[in-house]
From Swiss-Prot:
UniProt protein name: Imidazole glycerol phosphate synthase subunit HisH
Keyword Cell wall biogenesis/degradation belongs to the record: no
EC number: 4.3.2.10, 3.5.1.2
Catalytic residues, chain numbering: C81 (nucleophile), H183, E185
Domain Glutamine amidotransferase type-1 stretches: 3-208
Keywords: Amino-acid biosynthesis, Cytoplasm, Glutamine amidotransferase, Histidine biosynthesis, Hydrolase, Lyase
GO biological process, one term: L-histidine biosynthetic process
Catalytic activity: 5-[(5-phospho-1-deoxy-D-ribulos-1-ylimino)methylamino]-1-(5-phospho-beta-D-ribosyl)imidazole-4-carboxamide + L-glutamine = D-erythro-1-(imidazol-4-yl)glycerol 3-phosphate + 5-amino-1-(5-phospho-beta-D-ribosyl)imidazole-4-carboxamide + L-glutamate + H(+); L-glutamine + H2O = L-glutamate + NH4(+)
InterPro entries according to UniProt: Class_I_gatase-like (IPR029062), GATASE (IPR017926), Imidazole-glycPsynth_HisH (IPR010139)
Amino acid sequence: MRPIAIIDYGMGNLLSVQKALDRLGYPVEVTDDPGEITAAPGVILPGVGAFADAMANLQQKGLVAAIREVAERGVPLLGICLGLQLLFSTSEEGGQVAGLDLLPGEVKRLPAGIKVPHMGWNQVRFPRPGALFRGIPGGTDFYFVHSYYIVPREEEVVTGTTEYGLEFAVSIQRGNLFGVQFHPEKSSRRGLEVLKNFGELVRHAGNAGH
């Protein structure tokens, strides 16, 4: 299996994600090279920080077109934390900022009156089956650090929700697109299982393509 590409655009906890996949036995490469990203059998878009800065960095490095090509070709693509948010159309962070627009919906700030960022362990419920959560019971705790949340326009893409001031989507799946708001690489054994499930999706997609 060729390495899974972890996109380096200057705004991710790349080492933790890389170490987690190494531990699981999947070959990985951290790269900002569009050619390596489009050639990879699976791609991970991590990220922490501001939405507008992230989009600016992706544009500057010529990675927006590469990510869109990966998505259109049916290659498994996983967004983590800010990486999940970037998959959507727009964010209200820093005004109205355009995202990758791979999924219709917007990113909103968590409501006033609760402690922001939402930081720590929280339960995730599964409103419908998701391939990332295979073998994981509903109500499992995962580790979060975020101030904004996704509002998908299509309810059927939502595979996980949590409650913090309000109930909101924290996991999506549509075709080859996957995303989680929590940090699987910081979520202990269950988080590793999420990454393993993604790794197996990549492996099977690669086998099916040959």
